[in-house]
Amino acid sequence: MQGFKLAIDGPAGAGKSTVCQKLSQKLGWEHIDTGAMFRALTLYLLENKIQIQNEQFLNKALTKVEIVYLDNKIFLNQEDVSLKIKNYIVEKDVSVIASLPAVRKKLLTLQKGICKKIPYLIMDGRDIGTVVIPDADLKIFLTANITQRALRKQEELKKKGTQMEIHDIIEQLKKRDYQDYHRKLSPLQRSSEALLLDTTKLSIDEVVMQIQDLINKKTSPCLK
């Protein structure tokens, strides 16, 4: 087998990043969290107070941005921003930033370049199976009901020392979902080839096991 590309898409809080990290550790494959790339770019635009409504200013700013994914860490202009990109302000604005054509074009070019260089790759995001790796060997769409997704987000925030009421998180997720599903460029959608996996009642390990089984079914004929 020459390589394997696994594309995992789904809404915020479905468990994509955690599942992909565990899969990466188990399989020894590279994992690229494209959401982290969008958050890193959002962080840059916020910190530098770039007027995103001004296309000329935005395009000029994007030429100064270098994003590198290395050892499950995200570097923005050579600075490790893996923790900084997880703050509430970035999370709140990333969906708006991600809808900008110039931003998507820059990161799509970077993501496609990564796909060509890494033979065994797990990539997760919103449009991986539909746009970034349309020829992926296996496509999965992870989802969960909004209450479960909100509870996961709340737990994630607690670990970062942030308290947030569950109803506020649910409202935030609803807004994020609407933006992701309705943006004009590369909206969140399930590829016709993607297998739907509802994680509402599943543990992370159970999801990982199911995906491993799917990978084994795909690869076993190649190994005979």
Curated annotation (Swiss-Prot):
It holds the Pfam family Cytidylate_kin. GO terms for molecular function: ATP binding; CMP kinase activity; dCMP kinase activity. Its main location: cytoplasm. Gene3D superfamilies: P-loop containing nucleotide triphosphate hydrolases. SUPFAM superfamilies: P-loop containing nucleoside triphosphate hydrolases (SSF52540). ATP binds at residues 10-18. It comes from the Bacteria. This is Cytidylate kinase. It comes from Phytoplasma australiense.
